Amino acid sequence: MSSQLGRKESIYEEDDSDNLGQKDKSILYTNPQIKYIKSDSFEKLRLRSLIAIGNPIVDISSNIEEDVIDKFGLKWGETVFANESNVGFFKELEKNKNVKYIPGGSIQNTLRTCAWCLGMEPGRDKTFTITMLGATGKDSYRNKIIDALHFAGVKDLLECIPDKETSRCGVGICKKERCLLPEIRASNMINVDFIIDNLKKIDDHDALLLEGYFIQERYEICRDLCKRFKQKRKTVILTLSAVFMVQTYYDKFIELANYSDLIIANKAELEELAKEKDKENKDLFIKISKKLVKKKRLFIVTDGKKGVIVAKYDYKRGTMDFILRGFPKPVKSEDIVDLNGAGDAFLGGFLSQYMLGKSFEACCKAGNDVAGIIIKNIGCTFPKNFKINFAD
């Protein structure tokens, strides 16, 4: 298998044995005061470092009237990508005096949450390394993103595309419902040369996290990074991101899932990957596993109020073992402000305890607890005096 990226040097080495194809200190950036218990022995840690590739985005968030989404052809609870007919939605949001500019994007939200839950501090943490890989434009949005990452203790490995603008996402909120309008600009333009020039830094990480949204334009980079990490016997984590993404890029998701050790999805995304509807959970997992290369693989699946399922495929026996179903704590409807970022925060909380080597029960509890905090705020942000205890 050879790289299709058009440069003599590939992201991965050929291997015939491989059979897989000024900083804002406002509430938006406030570090929570977290009480947690680290493993007594670092030998218990599953992962010391994590790098994620995805779309660095600034969310432009504002309350809107109900008729605004009809005006621009948007849908509550769904994502519609920006085009000429709906790009005016951003001006509609910015007319609101309470509009907020929040560093966001699925992977950025997850990494910042993970770092917060690990109690990481900018430039001081010697135990863990968390890095975001991507691309931005040369503008004020880039500065906002880098400031937010650094304040959370996350390193940036962000290519600067001078002639493009940083990606943005319009977030309209009305009666606790939301609509999303991402405009993916510079983040789609990351160059393979930038990846190759930074391979040493990338190789220093124990695990790779892939944002499903990112494969839309940069699938080859994702595939080759997956192969490189697997050749080095490192961990690959894949998020499915959205039902329409799995529908549109089904074969690509299947190939990336073949490399993955952990697959993160909600129930609807899992059904789309299995090409089955209304099946029992066990049947869905088995159907998916039959489509993939036989290897150890974890599934972490969120299903709203029905909780979180963690399941493990035993390739030697050809069976699917359900490890647990974790339930979120109920949140009063009047306390819910914005559901945007809840899933990202869940994954961040889950991964923080996974890195520490904690039980899957502890991982799910952390994810659910953090998501419960996030939905009480606008975007993936924490209140000033946020405290949480992740002890088993």
Language-model features: locations:
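Conserved phosphate-binding/catalytic region of the ribokinase-like
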Residues: 1-56, 60-63, 277-392
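Substrate-binding N-lobe of the ribokinase-like
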Residues: 4-32, 38-42, 84-168, 391
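Conserved beta-alpha-beta core of the PfkB/ribokinase-like small-molecule kinase fold
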Residues: 20, 27, 207-287, 297-298, ...
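Cofactor-binding loop segments of dinucleotide-utilizing enzymes, especially the Rossmann-like FAD-
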Residues: 53-55, 134-138, 173-175, 183, ...
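Short catalytic helix/loop segments, enriched in acidic residues and glycine
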Residues: 67-95
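Anion (oxyanion) recognition and catalysis
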Residues: 115, 150, 230-231, 293
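Conserved phosphate-binding/catalytic loop of the ribokinase/pfkB sugar-kinase fold
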Residues: 152, 157-162, 169-218
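Structural alpha-helical scaffold elements that stabilize or flank donor/cofactor-binding regions
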Residues: 200-201, 253-256, 292
